[in-house]
Structures are given as structure tokens and as C-alpha cells.
Amino acid sequence: MRLFGVVNASPDSLHTESIVRTPEEAMDRARLLLANGADAIDLGAQGSTDIAEVVEWTVEWNRMEALVPQLARLGVDVSVDTWRPEVAARALAAGATVLNAADGMQQEAMWVVAAEHGVPVVVPFLSGADPRSMTMVEGDPVEAIVGFFEARLATAARFGIRERCILDPGTGFAPPNWPWEQRYHYQKEVYSRLDELRVFGLPLYIALPWRRTDQHDELLELVVRQQPEFGRVHHPERVREIERRLGIGIG
């Protein structure tokens, strides 16, 4: 599994270790992630949880503007994690090499940006217009995810970039006030059925659990066993440890 290590330029991330405020802090964080087993960097500057302040796209971009070219000098892929096409376009022009589209590619403008820059696109499932407006998924979650991807990939084909799409079942996002026990069972159901998402013939990308509880550890190992192509991770060393224990090749 290729791992994208998380660097957060948003000050209200739940994972405080990932927060950076200067290019120097961003480089230190990125180098640590790469040393611990990450292959690439995922950079975001707008929190997606309900506790994060929603800022204007100009503020989001200002937070990461100086970071993108610095991280690009590391010689690894850098993904820009955003739901704003204005931010995506600027980050890709500044050296980012992957679009991690936190709007689920539901905006036409995001497809325009992706097509213009010719980059791989992570397409996450969302039950809302963006991560801040999620609703509960009714019925079979995998059926809902498949239906969502069918619609997004039809648009991708229209823009001629279907083959560059990477599919994310969206388990890193959640509606506000979702009880953990319910979310745990939802994620376990989705992770147990990742093979059903391979019907599209495209790589899979999972936002990997980072909290240290028995249930989070169980979910992390479940994902690693499914061997998706990509993972978004705060602690790459945990993933590599599980891979070694299970005898799963790294890379």
C-alpha cells in the first residue's frame, strides 16, 4: 500500500501532531512521515470536522501557499486536500501532483481543474455537498457508495480522465454527532466489502484510522488485510508494522 502521510495547515485539526504553522514545521513533519514509512504527503488547510472553523478559500490558500513548493522539493507526490476549486488550481500550479477532492468531485469546476492539470484524482464518497454537510447513509452503505461512484465516473469519462480516478469510500468523513459505536459498525461493513468497489477497475484509497483503541486497531488491520492501493495516514509506522506481521509486501 502506498501511504500519503498527513500534514495539516489548519489549526483546528483533531490530530494535533499533524498541525504545522510554518514551512519549516511542514518540512519537519513531512520528513518524519517519510522516515516512518510514508511514500507521499497529503496537505490540507481547511478542517473537515464540525469543530473546525470554515474559512474563506483565500485564507485556506494562504495557509498552504508557502508550503506546497517546499514539500514538492522532497521529490515525492504531494496531494492537495480541498473542496475548493480555487485552492486546488493554485496548489497544483505550485507543485502539488495529486488532487484529493474533498467535495467528492461534485463540482464541475473541480473536473475542469483536474483535466487542465492532468493529475490523479482521489474521489471520496460523500453523503453531502462537502464534508461539513454530511447526512446519514440510509440502507446498504456499499450500494450507496457504488451508486455515487457510477455518477462521478460518468462525469470523469466526459472530461476524459476516468482512468486517473482513485476511489475512496469516504470513511474518513462523518455526519456531526455520529455515535462512535454506529460509525465503527459502518466502517467495518464498508472495509469488509472493499472488493465490491473493484467493479470499476480503479485503485482504492482509504483514510486509515489513527486513534488508539481496540476498535480502531481492529479497523486498521482489517483495511491492511484488504490491500487497497493507497492509504491516507497519520502514523505510517503502524501500517508498516501490521504489513510486516501479516507478511504483506511494502510498496
Where would I find each of the regions flagged by the language model?
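Active-site-adjacent loop and "lid" segments of alpha/beta metabolic enzymes
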Residues: 5, 13-28, 50-66, 85, ...
